Amino acid sequence: LRPDHANRRRRRAGAERPGRVPPARPYSIDDDTDFLPAVKRSIRGWKIAYSPDLDVFPVDPQVSRVIDAQVKAFEEEGAHVEEVKVGIRRPQQELSDLWCRLIIPRNITGLDAAKAGGVDLLGEHHQDFPAEYLRWIAVGQHLSAVDFYKDQEIRTEIYDAIQSVLNDYDLLVTPTLACLPVDNANDGNTVGPSEINGEQVDPLIGWCLTYPLNFTGHPAASIPAGLSEEGLPVGMQIIGR
């Protein structure tokens, strides 16, 4: 944690004040925490869990080598690092589908609001949307309330798995991404790989080890961990309570 990160976090934290537009969100917390002391806080004696793959993600060997080496930095600072099984049992392809199902209704309502305001994005600019996005819009149009509640049950499973680790450890560390960076597409629709280590992944999101934390709400930060053999950046995700 750097001082600029700590200052930014302090300014963004806390409840929104009455009279602000938009109005205060009901789940915000009025907590004036000073994060600057954490910059110099020791981690000596901390227990840190290390999951190379959140149990279910295929990870590029170059990514694994960098993260395996860099977790030793925690030990050099006096922490105790243990490799763990998180307990996630759902296949990663099922989890990436879950993320898309959960995020697409908000997209649909946003598109509907724009249309009500006189801007029909799907009607007037249909050809400008990626095919993957249009496919999920179509799926989202047919989701039911029962589907929604079934998906919430899966979210609970993921939360319980992550929290069970953090009940015994101070932090959980993983790779940020399962793959190395990809080239930007010429058509503006850059996606990730469709396969890692011979296993199919969703090119939209299936190579990210970050989105399961969208299910759980645990605080998480990604930091630079090193470079691949080709000099490409590799990130490390640090998950807290």
Which functions belong to the PLM regions below?
Residues L1-V71, E77, G117-G118:
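A short helix-breaking turn/cap at a secondary-structure junction
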Residues Y27-D31, W99-R101, K150, V182-W207:
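Short, surface-exposed loop/helix-turn segments at secondary-structure junctions
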